[in-house]
Amino acid sequence: MSSIPFDQKTISLLGMKMDTSDFYTFADRWLFSTNHKYIGTLYLLFSIGAGLAGLALSVIMRMELASCGDLILNSNYQLYNTIVTAHALIMIFFFVMPALIGGFGNWFVPLLMGAPDMAFPRLNNISLWLLPSSLILLLLSSYVEIGAGTGWTVYPPLSSITGHSGPSVDLAIFSLHLAGVSSMLGAINFICTIKNMRLKGLTGERLSLFVWAVLVTVILLLLSLPVLAGAITMLLTDRNFNTSFFDATGGGDPILYQHLFWFFGHPEVYILILPGFGIVSIIIQAYANKAIFGYLGMVYAMLSIGILGFMVWAHHMYTVGLDVDTRAYFTAATMIIAVPTGIKIFSWLATLFGSYLKLRTPLLFILGFLILFTLGGLSGVVLANSGLDIAFHDTYYVVAHFHYVLSMGAVFAAFAAFYHWFSIIKSFTTYEPHEWEFVYNPFELRKKIPYRRTDFSYLETAGILHFITTFIGVNLTFFPMHLLGLAGMPRRIPDYPDAYLHFNLISSYGSFVTLVSTIMFFMFGVVFNYNLFINGFPSMFYIIKPLIKITFFRIKQIIQGNNECLNSISKELTILILHVKRLSKLSVNNWSIA
């Protein structure tokens, strides 16, 4: 790419012409920013894009599983496994972690401590820009040769040179390395910020629970990621340099990889959910209008979860031949984790008890979180039993369990935080310096900004509709999976006997409902405010019509085996995009972040 001549007056960027001075201002403000608010906003935008890609992959899987036999993948089972791998890695490393830690963490950890910025602003910037590079490598791994169809665990010997001979797994490993470096740099930054940049007098007992949650999370990252890096580096040398760390024919052991991976993998689960715990605490505190019940107990519960998270990794490995004493220990240790988690759940309920609650969108998502996360935890207690897990291992019961914890735990917390902090994030450059003390003063529960405009609020009705449709969609998708797992349906298999048809069909319809609710979230809840909703109603009608047609009628045709309708879908998508572009012109004045 050639550099821009200094005498050139205009430049074309993404099809738009702008003055070079405007371009340099844009680049300096966004691409090279050291401001934690700009970087946090970019993290959120990146996670939204990655989340949509992950959602699209999951819908493709559910379309394939909507009926017995082959529907859309033409018996290409390797492609199905590649989609499974990409979906998992994208959702974990490029959606949940950038949104909860990079996005909301960067935005609000300094504000909740009274800090001017993060401790290392340039480190903050590079930890952001490593993520798009990592995502590109992961997407390339899916396109190179047969793709990386190993599952997100990348177990050898399937991931070895005999199982995947092409460079696809190598690219996926490099992608994980880059994402790990990004997370490590961010973790160092957060630890230094929280330790050294608090307001004078803001001791640990007065720190926000969200800051505590982020602190425990980044300590877990700092301790667990080097183990993953070592495991995948050994796998890389096994594949390319003739070592035999995980090759039994050369004296290695594939079970060693499983121990190393899950020593990272189980703390990773808590890394994903702990920032969500902090968000739940903040929103419940705001809507109950009182301090969280048992503050110190909540802090110690998070610390206990972090410590115990490193002591239970082998409950993912009950089927590999562990001796009975080892299985007894890991069963007991896993069940003990339910104690601090239960303390947090009951403390939140005790805070809500007796409060006058206005059921706004953020609180609805938090209540959904409490119900569904608890259900997911109960199925986790079942899986903790080493005897029962022999039957449930690698079935859809496990898929249902961790999606109840993540899809309805971490993601519900992210939606709640987005709605709760929406006006601040969208209008942060419009606040005067003296107004920030009203936005977040760590010593006050909440204050209203006097005479503040409400131009940047979301549509409450649209938010509630988004919650209801999402709640119905995710439960329709994942609850039948418990029953499929109990009946013995294995995961990561694109075909199944017709005895499993009805529950799979319900699950697929649930994923389509979730897809529609996500589209509604972008159309009505985020991008457009009330005035635009009224002025742009005719254009919205033209958007909704092809959307309904694609969602219900075309998908039904695909399920029935009519693949000729794919051309019609592409035409309808083209029409849809044209109308979205037309409508976006109406929203230009309402959708400027800076």
UniProtKB/Swiss-Prot annotation:
Heme a3 binds at H401. The chain crosses the membrane at residues 41-61, 89-109, 126-146, 171-191, 209-229, 260-280, 292-312, 333-353, 363-383, 405-425, 467-487, 508-528. The keyword Ribosomal protein does not apply. GO terms for molecular function: cytochrome-c oxidase activity; heme binding; metal ion binding. The keyword Amino-acid biosynthesis does not apply. This is Cytochrome c oxidase subunit 1. Its main location: mitochondrion. Component of the cytochrome c oxidase, the last enzyme in the mitochondrial electron transport chain which drives oxidative phosphorylation. The respiratory chain contains 3 multisubunit complexes succinate dehydrogenase (complex II, CII), ubiquinol-cytochrome c oxidoreductase (cytochrome b-c1 complex, complex III, CIII) and cytochrome c oxidase (complex IV, CIV), that cooperate to transfer electrons derived from NADH and succinate to molecular oxygen, creating an electrochemical gradient over the inner membrane that drives transmembrane transport and the ATP synthase. Fe(II)-heme a binds at H87, H403.
